[in-house]
Amino acid sequence: MEALGIIVEYNPLHNGHLYHLEESIKLTKCQYVVAVMSGNFVQRGEPAIVDKWKRAEMALKAGVDLVIELPVVYATSTAENFAYGAVKLLDSLKVIDCIAFGSEEGDLEKLSKIADILLEEPPDYKRALKENLGKGLTFAKARELALVKVTGDESISKTLQTSNNILGIEYLKALKKIKSSIVPFTIKRRGALYTSLKLEGEFASATSIRKAIEEKGIKAVKNYVPDFTLKILERAFKEGQGPVYLQDFSPIILYLLRSGHPLENIFDVAEGIDNKIYKAASMTNNIKDLIKLTKSKRYTESRIRHILLHLLLKIDKKLFKEFDGPNYIRVLGFSEKGKTILKEIKKKTELPIITKVAQYKSKIEDSRMFERDLFATDVYTLAYKNFAISKLDFFHPIIKL
């Protein structure tokens, strides 16, 4: 049994994702595909445009055999934590032979070399990093310049400018850190950059697709997503279950901030950023403006989004300190082929497999992380136009194809 692991968000699944999946299967020659996928909230620090079950359905229709949820505490964290949680989860299945990820670089050796330095932190790198931080540079910029200095490779600066390269490096770092036997592969990304806002070419970015849906409606993206994605999105929107955006939670987040809800224990809050956020919350009535008022060279838009989302979802620093990766396997969906690999996982894994949510307390020794997932769904459904009920995790069926 040859099994390929992929780490995805499919927010939503578009032509570029389909290309990555098909090329990954060709390159690795694997029989089975297991996807670890973000749930209802994603790594950008935002809600997914439609819920995790609809996106799991997209994954299965694209050719994935088994979809497993990445816990929300990892799915909404930094690139490093996101990658570590996802890789640790794939490794814990005990059936994954390969992992394939997209990157703008397309050069596994170069990405691996960077990952080695970041993981091992040799003395010359640490000195350069400390020196750069002392100059008041952001951590990302200080790290970039330190890597250039110790390698003598100026092109590393360009490599670290794109999100898929950064995630790829973090995947490799995580594999090395846990001494995984999973073999990595990378597929060179085609089409628009992840952050591109323009709908153009055969492969538009997920960011531009979400923006087009928000501004022009679903029909505007029909050439950039597979037919099955379009149909799933149309069905969801017709039923009042999407599209969901961060601004849909503006009243709740602003209520928490204006009522003085403490921020100091929220992950990634430091250096007085909480005071800046409180001040901005008193000057606006929506999240978009709050982020504009708060962001700066030091406090990026991404960081502010993550802080606000963690406030909304009650994710604090303690969860990261007390857990070393996901401690359960939550199944969102599987195909006929997926049944076979799920049986194999059941034989080999040491983690509890959750297929019936009502049984989670008897299966998971420390259920705090899982309970964040349940709470995240309850919060997410507040943005629905219809059927905005709680406890959806308890009765929504697993997606089967």
Swiss-Prot record:
Keywords: ATP-binding, Cytoplasm, Ligase, Nucleotide-binding, RNA-binding, tRNA processing, tRNA-binding. It is found in: Cytoplasm. Gene3D superfamilies: HUPs. The keyword Ribosomal protein does not apply. The keyword Transcription does not apply. One of its GO terms (cellular component) is cytoplasm. Disulfide bonds: none annotated. InterPro entries: Rossmann-like_a/b/a_fold, tRNA(Met)_cyd_acetate_ligase. Its EC number is 6.3.4.-. One of its GO terms (biological process) is tRNA modification. ATP binds at residues 7-20, 102, 164, 189. One of its GO terms (molecular function) is ATP binding. It catalyses: cytidine(34) in elongator tRNA(Met) + acetate + ATP = N(4)-acetylcytidine(34) in elongator tRNA(Met) + AMP + diphosphate. Catalyzes the formation of N(4)-acetylcytidine (ac(4)C) at the wobble position of elongator tRNA(Met), using acetate and ATP as substrates. First activates an acetate ion to form acetyladenylate (Ac-AMP) and then transfers the acetyl group to tRNA to form ac(4)C34. Belongs to the TmcAL family. HAMAP family: TmcAL. This is tRNA(Met) cytidine acetate ligase.
